[in-house]
């Protein structure tokens, strides 16, 4: 896939929205929108990469795809967790579960950990990495099924999946006491 500098511009806007949200600028507006932009960009890029691979080879090399994703994202997460584990006992001495929280984040389970158990408390910002990693695990398998359909069924199949996902997200948002579940749980993103 060719490099597209416009996508870097969108990433920059998304970063600014997230930073503005956490700095409480603009009344806290824009943070979730910025994360949504990241998710859409990631979904677009991953779908395009996998679709181009399928068009070129007639198959998907999912193992190689997973290995690339892990090599790209995991080193930075491990560095963050190492720094956290080294500093957290002194910076957050009142919190006794640093190792548990790092394990939850390191296993890309922060989205469920926070939604279900309110952990990892000081690493809750890793929820978006968890959601993205879960997407990386599921989406290639969904595309494998879609690519086995006749080509004229591809768009309707993906549209049907999007509609079903939207209905499920609305259901959870309207019938769950926790407002944050639609953001933090993979099954609603």
Task: Label every PLM stretch briefly.
Residues 8:
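Mature N-terminal segment immediately following signal peptide/propeptide cleavage
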Residues 3-4, 13-189:
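Hydrophobic membrane-embedded alpha-helices
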């Amino acid at each position: 896939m060719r490099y597209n500098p416009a996508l870097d511009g969108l990433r920059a806007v998304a970063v600014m929205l997230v930073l503005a949200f956490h700095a409480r600028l603009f009344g806290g507006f824009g943070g979730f929108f910025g994360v949504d932009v990241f998710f859409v960009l990631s979904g677009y890029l991953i779908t395009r990469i996998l679709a181009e691979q399928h068009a070129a080879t007639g198959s998907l090399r999912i193992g190689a795809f997973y290995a690339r994703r892990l090599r790209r994202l995991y080193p930075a997460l491990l560095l963050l967790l190492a720094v956290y584990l080294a500093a957290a006992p002194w910076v957050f001495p009142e919190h006794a579960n640093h190792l548990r929280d790092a394990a939850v984040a390191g296993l890309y389970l922060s989205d469920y950990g926070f939604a279900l158990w309110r952990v990892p408390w000081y690493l809750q910002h890793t929820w978006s990495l968890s959601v993205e990693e879960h997407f990386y695990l599921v989406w290639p398998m969904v595309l494998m099924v879609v690519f086995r359909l006749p080509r004229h069924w591809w768009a309707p199949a993906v549209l049907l999946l999007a509609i079903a996902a939207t209905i499920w997200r609305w259901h959870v948002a309207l019938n769950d006491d926790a407002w944050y579940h639609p953001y933090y749980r993979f099954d609603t993103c």
